[in-house]
């Protein structure tokens, strides 16, 4: 019997990740570079068979899964990034101005 394996892949670049802004529930699209990143990874994954592919329901993640060749990946709300609340969209330095111990 084969050992189970878990493969993890982060979504491609977004405008906010490019700028160092924290993103949780804001549903951002991939940048052109993010699309290219996913396409490059797809080449490495070509021919790999997975029993199950899961993705966050957010577009940046589900679009990445589709570009990787898994358009039918199951969307799981539990895989969405944590909620940054009032810090959504801010950079770490901007957050630390408001909350120095953050």
Predicted regions located by residue number:
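Solvent-exposed, charged interface segments at domain starts and junctions
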Residues: 1-3, 76
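Active-site-proximal alpha-helix that buttresses catalytic centers in soluble enzyme cores
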Residues: 3-4, 9-71, 98
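Phosphate-handling substructures
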Residues: 68-102
């Amino acid at each position: 019997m084969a050992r189970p394996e878990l493969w993890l892949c982060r979504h491609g670049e977004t405008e906010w990740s490019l700028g160092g802004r924290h993103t949780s529930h804001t549903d951002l699209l991939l940048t052109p570079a993010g699309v290219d990143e996913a396409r490059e990874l797809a080449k490495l994954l070509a021919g790999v068979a997975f029993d199950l592919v899961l993705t966050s329901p957010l577009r940046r993640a589900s679009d990445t899964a589709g570009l990787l060749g898994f358009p039918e990946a199951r969307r799981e709300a539990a895989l969405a990034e944590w909620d940054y609340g009032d810090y959504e969209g801010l950079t770490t330095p901007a957050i630390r101005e408001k909350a120095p111990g953050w």
